[in-house]
């Protein structure tokens, strides 16, 4: 059903984030992330390059939608804890107060997610999400773009993948070939660039050129978006978690909490 609905849109779709909007995501593109991605890979394996490109691009937008929606709900519910500072308590009363804050936040998240389309779809597993975090789809997009005779996007996809996998020999060879093409340099860009990154680079260039006013201005403009991106990445660590083992109540809570903390310590803001 969703393949039929999407057919007309895919024929004219641009790059994966052109016209992307968190608040007004096209209904015709809404589908399970895993379904879109697996179908794109199926078309890749049968060498149906235009169809593969279209669905791989849609899967990238769906992943961003899921990530942005998760961050939106967690930011909105970040204060849904204890209503006032509780007096010191011991034993069961302290435990109940702690759990009350957890339950209030859980209720807030549940209500938030119920009203957003990203969570009305079947949710992807952790392994698939990590594949997107590693920018693995760009490995397939690069070759599909190339076979579809779209060299500018193939070059950009190869560069975007190499930023996360600088030692990948196959992609290094592909990039070496692309760089031998006239005017290839203008297409070497990171398709996952955050808005603050361009401002920061511009600020550094102004700094190196002793243009202090411009450097200060651009750096000040970059900082708010950097901290927003940082907060969004941290919020993503508190997203859905697959429960594979049956454990005691406290062991389960402890494992989940440690997993979230490890994610926050180790996360990469460039993903």
Curated annotation (Swiss-Prot):
GO biological process: chaperone-mediated protein folding; collagen fibril organization; negative regulation of collagen fibril organization
Segment forming the signal sequence: 1-15
Tissue expression profile of the protein: Found in articular chondrocytes. Expressed in a variety of tissues.
Keyword set, alphabetical order: Extracellular matrix, Glycoprotein, Secreted, Signal
Keyword Heme: no
Residues carrying sugar: 76
Cross-referenced Pfam families: TPR_leprecan
Subcellular location: Secreted, Extracellular space, Extracellular matrix
GO CC term (a single one): endoplasmic reticulum
Protein family (similarity comment): Belongs to the leprecan family.
Function: Necessary for efficient 3-hydroxylation of fibrillar collagen prolyl residues.
Record protein name field: Cartilage-associated protein
Provenance organism: Gallus gallus
Lineage: Eukaryota, Metazoa, Chordata, Craniata, Vertebrata
């Amino acid at each position: 059903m969703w393949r039929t609905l999407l057919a007309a849109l895919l024929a004219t779709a641009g790059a994966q984030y052109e016209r992307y909007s968190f608040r007004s995501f096209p209904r015709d593109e809404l589908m399970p992330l895993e379904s879109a991605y697996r179908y794109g890979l199926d078309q890749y394996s049968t060498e149906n390059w235009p169809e593969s490109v279209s669905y791989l691009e849609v899967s990238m937008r769906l992943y961003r939608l899921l990530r942005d929606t998760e961050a939106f709900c967690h930011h909105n519910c970040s204060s849904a804890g204890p209503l006032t500072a509780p007096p010191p308590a011991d034993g069961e009363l302290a435990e109940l107060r702690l759990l009350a804050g957890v339950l209030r936040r859980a209720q807030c998240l549940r209500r938030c997610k119920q009203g957003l389309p990203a969570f009305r779809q079947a949710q992807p597993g952790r392994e698939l999400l990590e594949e997107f975090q590693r920018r693995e789809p760009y490995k397939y997009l690069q070759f599909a773009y190339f076979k579809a005779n779209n060299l500018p996007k193939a070059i950009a996809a190869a560069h975007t993948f190499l930023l996360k996998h600088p030692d990948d020999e196959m992609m290094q060879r592909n990039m070496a070939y692309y760089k031998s093409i006239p005017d290839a340099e203008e297409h070497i860009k990171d398709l996952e660039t955050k808005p603050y990154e361009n401002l920061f680079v511009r600020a550094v260039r102004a700094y190196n050129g002793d243009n202090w006013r411009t450097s200060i201005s651009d750096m000040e403009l970059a900082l708010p978006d950097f901290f927003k991106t940082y907060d969004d990445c941290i919020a993503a660590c508190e997203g859905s978690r697959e429960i594979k083992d049956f454990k005691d109540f406290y062991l389960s809570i402890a494992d989940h909490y440690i997993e979230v903390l490890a994610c926050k310590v180790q996360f990469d803001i460039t993903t």
